[in-house]
C-alpha cells in the first residue's frame, strides 16, 4: 500500500489516471470562487456546531421545556408522561367547543401532544385552521400536566395563554411554558 509513495508521479499517472493529463506546473492555480466556497463551508460547519448546542442559549431547563432538544448532542435518557386538555372558545359568542383528542389523533400522536410543547402548539394551530374552514374565529387554551422520569405531574403550560395567537419561537423560550422550578 505504501509503494505508491516511491513511484514517480509520471508512473502513477500512466497506470491509474491515463485519461487525465499530468499537471507539471510548479504553481497551483487557485479557483476564482475559492473564497465563496471557503465562506460557504465555514457557515455549514458553524451551523453543524451551533445547532446541537442551541439549548445552552435558551432559558430554562431543556429537559423540562424540550426547547432545543431535537438535533442536539443530548442523550434521550428520560421519559415523559402527561395529560392535556384543549379548550376551544368561539370568539363571536364565547361558546366553549369540546375537543376530543381521540377524534383527531392516534395514540402515539396523543402522547406527543400531551407531553411536548411544539406538538401542543402545532395541534392548536391545526385546530385554529380547522375552525377557520368553518368560518369560526377561535381562541385555544391548553391545560397540561407533565411528569418526567416517573415524577408526579406538574403544570406545564400557562392555561391563560391563547395558543392560537402565539407565534412559534424557534431559538427563544416560549412564554406560555411554565418554569421548571
Show which residues each predicted segment covers.
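Hydrophobic alpha-helical transmembrane segments in integral membrane proteins
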Residues: 46-71
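Internal/C-terminal transmembrane anchor helices
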Residues: 28-55
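Membrane-interfacial, low-structure loops and terminal tails that flank and connect transmembrane helices
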Residues: 12-34
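Extracytosolic and intramembrane catalytic regions of membrane-associated proteins
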Residues: 66-181
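Hydrophobic cores of alpha-helical transmembrane segments in multi-pass inner/ER membrane proteins
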Residues: 1-15
Amino acid at each position: 500500500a505504501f509503494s505508491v509513495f516511491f513511484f514517480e508521479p509520471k508512473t502513477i499517472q500512466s497506470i491509474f489516471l491515463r485519461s487525465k493529463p499530468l499537471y507539471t506546473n510548479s504553481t497551483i492555480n487557485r479557483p476564482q470562487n475559492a473564497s465563496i466556497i471557503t465562506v460557504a463551508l465555514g457557515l455549514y460547519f458553524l451551523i453543524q456546531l451551533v445547532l446541537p448546542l442551541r439549548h445552552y442559549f435558551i432559558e430554562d431547563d431543556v429537559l423540562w421545556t424540550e426547547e432545543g432538544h431535537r438535533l442536539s448532542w443530548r442523550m434521550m435518557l428520560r421519559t415523559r408522561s402527561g395529560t392535556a386538555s384543549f379548550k376551544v372558545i368561539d370568539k363571536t359568542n364565547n361558546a366553549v367547543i369540546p375537543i376530543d383528542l381521540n377524534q383527531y389523533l392516534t395514540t402515539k400522536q396523543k402522547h406527543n401532544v400531551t407531553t411536548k410543547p411544539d406538538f401542543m402548539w402545532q395541534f392548536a394551530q391545526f385546530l385554529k385552521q380547522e375552525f377557520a374552514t368553518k368560518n369560526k374565529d377561535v381562541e385555544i387554551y391548553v391545560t397540561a400536566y407533565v411528569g418526567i422520569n416517573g415524577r408526579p405531574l406538574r403544570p406545564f403550560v400557562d392555561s391563560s395563554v391563547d395558543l392560537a395567537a402565539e407565534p412559534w419561537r424557534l431559538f427563544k423560550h416560549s412564554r406560555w411554558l411554565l418554569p421548571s422550578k
